[in-house]
A protein has these predicted regions:
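Acidic, metal-coordinating helix/loop segments flanking the phosphotransfer/catalytic sites
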Residues: 47-65
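Short amphipathic alpha-helix used as the core "switch/output" element in two-component signaling
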Residues: 56, 78-89
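Acidic catalytic/metal-coordinating carboxylates
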Residues: 50, 76-79
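Two-component/phosphorelay signaling modules centered on CheY-like receiver
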Residues: 27-46
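Alpha4 helix (beta4-alpha4-beta5 surface) of REC/receiver domains from two-component response regulators
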Residues: 79, 100-115
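Non-catalytic signal-transmission and effector/linker regions of two-component phosphorelay proteins
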Residues: 1-19, 29, 124-142
Length: 142
């Protein structure tokens, strides 16, 4: 089954519940996770590969949760977390990392990440964490 995810270059806002933004530059990983989040979690998923795409997608589509890779090209996921914090965004964010050291967890939390998720992980575990965040998340400011 070919997976489709939503790309609206004209910044069309969709009033869809459970909007997720996945930011990861690994195409294979992203495709598998996107498929699983949509098919098994029932989420509407947007995908961004680089920092500037993340910020544009947040502004346009107002996702409920950001799944953010710490190793994005150029400046990385921590740069995105700093930008979100500086701009006053309060978006539930799950930082995904292959190296969940105490320092990474501390730094991510200080920059506003809701949770640090070690890679690799099962998509079911991610779906459960997203559902948990959606239940307890206050309204987000975008």
């Amino acid at each position: 089954m070919l997976f489709r995810f939503w790309v609206f270059p004209d910044c069309t806002f969709l009033d869809i519940s459970k909007r997720i933004l996945l930011s990861d530059d690994n195409e294979g990983f992203s495709t598998l996770l996107l498929e699983s989040l949509h098919e098994h979690g029932g989420f509407h998923v947007f995908h961004a590969r680089e920092e500037h795409e993340v910020m544009e997608t947040i502004q346009c589509h107002k996702p409920h949760i950001l799944l953010l890779d710490d190793m994005l090209p150029h400046k990385g996921g921590f740069h995105v977390l700093r930008q979100l914090q500086e701009r006053g965004h309060r978006l539930s964010t799950i930082l995904m990392t292959v190296l969940p050291t105490q320092k990474i967890v501390r730094d991510a939390t200080e920059l506003g990440a809701s949770y640090v998720f070690p890679k690799p992980f099962s998509s079911q575990a991610m779906i459960e964490k997203i559902q948990e965040l959606l239940k307890r998340a206050p309204p987000t400011k975008h």
